[in-house]
């Protein structure tokens, strides 16, 4: 089964007011858990490799081959997007596309808007030739993303309008108060700004740093145009908690399958729960493949 672009998936999600989850992969077993959760929930899914973890995971070609083989061997029939998360340059995005990724995010959010737009346009021009969807970011999401620490900088509505019109991206991550990693205190999303940006750009929005955001805020973000929601920290915490518990209760355990399996099962349950929360469960039949 070939990977699919997220363009049509997100357009349907935005129109029907649900969201598709992006879940970051951290290895083969982790990927299996995400795919199995999607199949059980009959939900489309976005499996993402963060640029900063690509080499750790074996490189773009290895990742694409691994995920593709798992889809085939596990008889996965739901739509699967293979996405590059936080692509650091146009060249990295090209490498991902050439390796078979069906979607990329170019993250020029730490650059001045003119440079961000130029970098993004370079990616969208190349991606369009290969049927690959493109996500871009304006403003900066706070917290830590795979070692990159930053503060929150709200997206400027004029900059959002410019990048959408000048680059023809398929989805926009507009930073509006979310953070990567664990929240210190109650999350406080900028719903007023969110509504204005959604109305002005009229394309699917992406919520980064969604782990730990209360369900009522998630649902409100979906009604205001967010069709893609990124989850990573909650999965990592679920895995770590279960793995730590296994060692605490079984100090003599040394077989990897014995101590890794409970954590992977916790990841699967977390993903399934998020798919139900986002409203994507049962939506795979609309674009069934296989």
Swiss-Prot record:
The modification Phosphothreonine is found at residue 233. Pfam families: F_bP_aldolase. It is an enzyme of class 4 (lyase). InterPro entries: Aldolase_TIM (IPR013785), Class_II_FBP_aldolase (IPR050246), FBA_II (IPR000771), Fruc_bis_ald_class-2 (IPR011289). The active site is at residue 85. SUPFAM superfamilies: Aldolase (SSF51569). Its EC number is 4.1.2.29. CDD domains: TBP_aldolase_IIB. Zn(2+) binds at residues 86, 180, 208. Dihydroxyacetone phosphate binds at residues 181, 209-211, 230-233. It catalyses: 6-phospho-5-dehydro-2-deoxy-D-gluconate = 3-oxopropanoate + dihydroxyacetone phosphate. Its cofactor is Zn(2+). One of its GO terms (molecular function) is 5-dehydro-2-deoxyphosphogluconate aldolase activity. One of its GO terms (biological process) is glycolytic process. Pathway: Polyol metabolism; myo-inositol degradation into acetyl-CoA; acetyl-CoA from myo-inositol: step 6/7. Keywords: Lyase, Metal-binding, Phosphoprotein, Zinc. Belongs to the class II fructose-bisphosphate aldolase family. IolJ subfamily. Produces dihydroxyacetone phosphate (DHAP or glycerone phosphate) and malonic semialdehyde (MSA or 3-oxopropanoate) from 6-phospho-5-dehydro-2-deoxy-D-gluconate (DKGP). This is 6-phospho-5-dehydro-2-deoxy-D-gluconate aldolase. It comes from Bacillus subtilis (strain 168).
């Amino acid at each position: 089964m070939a990977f699919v672009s997220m363009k049509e998936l997100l357009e349907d999600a935005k129109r029907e007011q649900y969201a598709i989850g992006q879940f970051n992969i951290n290895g083969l077993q982790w990927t299996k858990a995400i795919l199995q959760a999607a199949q059980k929930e009959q939900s489309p899914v976005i499996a993402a490799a963060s640029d900063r973890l690509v080499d750790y995971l074996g490189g773009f070609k290895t990742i694409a081959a691994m995920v593709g083989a798992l889809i085939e061997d596990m008889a996965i029939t739901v739509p699967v997007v293979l996405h590059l998360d936080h692509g650091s340059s146009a060249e990295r995005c090209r490498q991902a596309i050439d390796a078979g990724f069906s979607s990329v995010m170019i993250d020029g959010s730490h650059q001045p808007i003119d440079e961000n737009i130029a970098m993004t346009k370079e990616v969208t021009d190349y991606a369009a030739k290969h049927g690959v969807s493109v996500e871009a970011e304006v403003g900066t999401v706070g917290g830590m993303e795979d070692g990159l620490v930053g503060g929150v900088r709200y997206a400027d509505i004029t900059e959002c309008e410019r990048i959408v019109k000048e680059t023809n991206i398929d989805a926009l991550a507009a930073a509006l108060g979310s953070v990567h990693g664990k929240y210190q205190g109650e999350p406080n999303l900028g719903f007023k700004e969110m509504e204005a940006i959604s109305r002005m750009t009229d394309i699917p929005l992406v919520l980064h740093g969604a782990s730990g955001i209360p369900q009522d805020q998630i649902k409100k973000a979906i009604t205001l145009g967010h069709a893609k929601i990124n989850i990573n920290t909650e999965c990592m915490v679920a895995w770590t908690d279960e793995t730590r518990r296994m060692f605490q209760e079984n100090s003599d355990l040394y077989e990897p399958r014995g101590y890794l399996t409970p954590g992977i099962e916790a990841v699967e349950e977390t993903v399934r729960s998020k798919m139900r929360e986002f409203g994507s469960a049962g939506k795979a039949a609309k674009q069934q493949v296989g």
